[in-house]
C-alpha cells in the first residue's frame, strides 16, 4: 500500500467540473488501483501506516492516453512532405499511388523485428511525456498477413514497455493495387476474413475504417461494422476529414466508440454522436500538417454535449507527430479548446474513446496510472510549447 502526498491532484472527475483540483492532496494505491483520494488532512486512519512518497507539491494528473495512432509502419514519407509543399494535395498524392500506398510497400517488405525497432523510439517519445495508454492501428499492410504482422508488433510494444496498448483492425484504410478493380473482393477476402482471423488470434480490440471519397463508402463501412458486431468487436471510424459523407452518423448508429477527424462534420452527425455517446476524436496534427482550413465544429459539439478527445494521429504521411503535449497546444491554438478541455481530451475522454472505464480519472477504483509533473498549474501542460515537465510516470501503481 502506497500513500502519495504533498501533491496537487488533478482528478479530471466529470462531476467536479474543470480540472477537479485537490490542493494539498493525497491518494492511496492498493493492488495497482486508487483506493482513496482527497485532501491530506482528511486521510483516514486506516492508511496511516502506508508507505509514503512525498511529491513535493508537484502536480499529479491521470496518465495521458493517446487514443488514435498509426505508430507501427515501415519507411517514411519525407518526400511526400516536400510534394505537398510544392502544391500537391492529399487526394492527388493518394490517387497517383503515393500516400498510404507508399507506406504499404515499405510495411509489407519489413519483418516484425524491423517494424518493432522502428516503432519503439516513437513510443518511447510518447511515454517520456506521461503517456500510459496507447492505441495502435494496423492499416499499412492491406493484406491479411501484413495487417496481422502489424498487430503482433503492437502487442509486443505493450509487452516490452510499461504502457497499455489497445489494438485496432484498420484493413479498411485504402484499396491495395491488387484489388483496385475489386472493392467487394477486398472487403470480403481481406477486411472481413482478416478480421475473423485476427479476432480468433486475440489480436484485435476494435475495428476502424476510413470513410472518404478516396477510401471506403458509408455503405461499405456499415457492412464491415455489421460483421464486427457479430464478432463482438467495438467500432470506430475516420470520418468527415475531407468531406461530409455521413460516416460519423452511420458510425454512431452502430454504437461506435469514436468518430475521428471530423473537420466536415454536419449537424446530423453531431446529433447522432450525442445520442450514442460516441466520442469526437480531434486530430490537430493532421489538420496542421495538411494545412487545412476547414475547422471541426467545436461550438456545435460543445452545445450538443459530445465528449471531445485529442490524439496525435501519429503516422508517416499526414501527422508525423509523437508529442501529446504539443497536440494539446494545437487543440487550444487551432481549435479554440480550453486547457481543461485539452487535458480531458487526453485523459477522461480518450479513455472513453477506447472503451476503457478504469482510467482517465483520479477517483477510487481507477487503475493507478498517473503522471507527476514539475509544474504548479495544469494549464501549463497546454500552454507551454516544446517543454516537457514530466517528473515521473506511475503505471498500475508502479513507478517507472
Swiss-Prot record:
Keyword hit for Transmembrane helix: no
Residues involved in 4-imidazolone-5-propanoate binding: 77, 140, 173, 241, 318
A Pfam family the protein falls into: Amidohydro_1
UniProt pathway: Amino-acid degradation; L-histidine degradation into L-glutamate; N-formimidoyl-L-glutamate from L-histidine: step 3/3
Entry's cofactor comment: Binds 1 zinc or iron ion per subunit.
CDD domains: Imidazolone-5PH
Family per record: Belongs to the metallo-dependent hydrolases superfamily. HutI family.
Full protein name: Imidazolonepropionase
Biological source species: Paracoccus denitrificans (strain Pd 1222)
Lineage, opening ranks: Bacteria, Pseudomonadati, Pseudomonadota, Alphaproteobacteria, Rhodobacterales
Encoding gene, per UniProt annotation: hutI
